[in-house]
């Protein structure tokens, strides 16, 4: 077992484990840690706890110290420098005629590196741009190409539901989302209805998917023939979460709604699925 704390470096960012280095660190505290990018400032979202070896990536990097007001001042200064760096880089991108969109700029806490995040449809030769930026900022330069989902996460915005984007408020990682999830939930497959601001399938399609899959295993499919107290019927509609079925009575050409529980009480029997 390892004693660790969980640290985030960005809102809704991924959580990384660190060795607390003898410190007892409370939730919501801020710390200075050594990372692969250099010295960084992060927020503790998981206080000291014991985790299994399989849940950590070894070797664990250590906390340098608990952050104080002076460290927070440096963070704010870095944010202001990043705004200026964004404008400078934007002008250089135009000067070099590069087909890329600058999304964000970030200084590491110790200012040993400046990271420029961008999107582009293809590969971009930015070697000359890097040289220009290095001569201006006198530090290490990294240009990192990101995808459209990461862009939406960084910039934030309002989703089709009218709420702030999930990815920019609480989702630490992107999980795979498939068109099958929309089909299983009987949603419209119109891309404008099931796509987020990033143009990809909405992350929220994943949230209730397990419940839909479990419920669908218990309910008959649309098109399936069943026997009801009113005679044989064909399932023509299905509200999975409310467990309500619309069935068309074969002998009466009439559509009736039943809850699945009502059908079970009537001794419903599934027959064969029809085309």
Curated annotation (Swiss-Prot):
Primary site of residence = cytoplasm
Note whether Transmembrane helix occurs among the keywords.
Answer: no
Name one process (GO BP) from the record.
sporulation resulting in formation of a cellular spore
What compartments host this protein? Cytoplasm
From the UniProt record, which GO molecular function terms apply?
mRNA binding
> Where does this protein have coiled-coil stretches?
none
Q: Which domain of life is it from?
A: Bacteria
Q: Respond yes or no to whether keyword Cytoplasm is given for this record.
A: yes
- Reported function: Essential for the phosphorelay during initiation of sporulation. May control the level of phosphorylated spo0A through spo0E activity during sporulation.
- What protein is this chain from? Stage 0 sporulation protein YaaT
Task: Please name the taxonomic classification of the source.
Answer: Bacteria, Bacillati, Bacillota, Bacilli, Bacillales
Name the gene behind this protein: yaaT
